[in-house]
Regions:
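Covalent nucleotidyltransferase core used to form phosphodiester bonds in nucleic acids
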Residues: 97-100, 104-108, 115-119
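Peptidyl-prolyl cis-trans isomerase
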Residues: 78, 110-112
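Pre-active-site segment of Zn-dependent metallo-hydrolases
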Residues: 66-67, 78
Length: 187
C-alpha cells in the first residue's frame, strides 16, 4: 500500500513538473513601438510562420475576417488621436482585423473589443475605423509575420505588415500641434 502511494506521489510530482515547463510557442509574441509626433503607436501581435503553406486565399481565406496574426487578436495602441490613411482614429487600444477581399483589395479594421482570441467573437458594431488598402508584392518573402515602421518623419510613419509574399502599408499621421497645446495647458 505504501509503495502504491509513493509511486502515485512520484508520478504526480513528475506530471506537475512537466506541466510547469515553458516551451517555445509556434507563433511567438512580438511588439513594435514607434513615436510619431508626440504619441507612441504600439503593435502587439503573435508571429505565425508560413511553414510551406499557401497563406493568402488558403490559410487566410479571401473575403473572411482574420485576426492579423495568431492567438489573441493583434493589438494597436495609440496614446493620442492619429490619422490612418487620412481617417481619424481616436487614442485608445484596438484589435486589428483584416479582410483580404481579393488579391488587390484588403479592408483593415480597428475594433474596440480588445480581448478577443482570434476572430470568432468579432462584432462589426464595435468597429471604430475601416480603411481599404492595396497589398503589394514583397521584395523578399517573409517566413514569420512581421509588423514594422518605415518612412518615419516628425509627424508621420508607415506601418508595414509583411508575411509570405505580400506587404501591406498603412500611412499614419499624428498632429503634434494639438498635443503641444494640451501639454502647455497641463503644465
Amino acid at each position: 500500500m505504501i509503495q502504491i502511494l509513493i509511486s502515485t506521489l512520484v508520478g504526480l510530482s513528475f506530471t506537475l513538473g512537466v506541466q510547469a515547463q515553458e516551451l517555445p510557442k509556434p507563433s511567438p509574441s512580438a511588439s513594435v513601438m514607434q513615436r510619431i509626433g508626440l504619441t507612441d503607436v504600439t503593435i502587439e501581435y503573435s508571429r505565425p510562420g508560413v511553414n510551406d503553406r499557401t497563406i493568402w486565399g488558403d490559410l487566410v481565406p479571401y473575403n473572411e475576417i482574420w485576426r492579423a496574426g495568431a492567438n489573441k487578436a493583434t493589438q494597436v495602441i495609440t496614446l493620442a488621436d492619429i490619422k490612418i490613411e487620412n481617417e481619424s482614429l481616436p487614442k485608445g487600444n484596438y484589435s486589428l482585423f483584416i479582410i483580404p477581399v481579393s488579391e488587390k483589395e484588403w479592408t483593415l479594421i480597428f475594433n474596440k473589443e480588445t480581448e478577443l482570441w482570434g476572430a470568432g467573437d468579432y462584432k462589426k458594431e464595435m468597429d471604430q475605423l475601416r480603411v481599404s488598402v492595396t497589398p503589394i508584392k514583397a521584395s523578399t518573402p517573409t517566413e514569420r509575420l512581421e509588423y514594422h515602421f518605415t518612412d518615419v518623419s516628425m509627424n508621420s510613419a508607415v506601418l508595414s505588415m509583411n508575411w509570405a509574399d505580400l506587404q501591406v502599408n498603412l500611412n499614419i499621421q499624428a498632429n503634434p500641434t494639438s498635443q503641444v497645446k494640451v501639454n502647455i495647458e497641463n503644465a
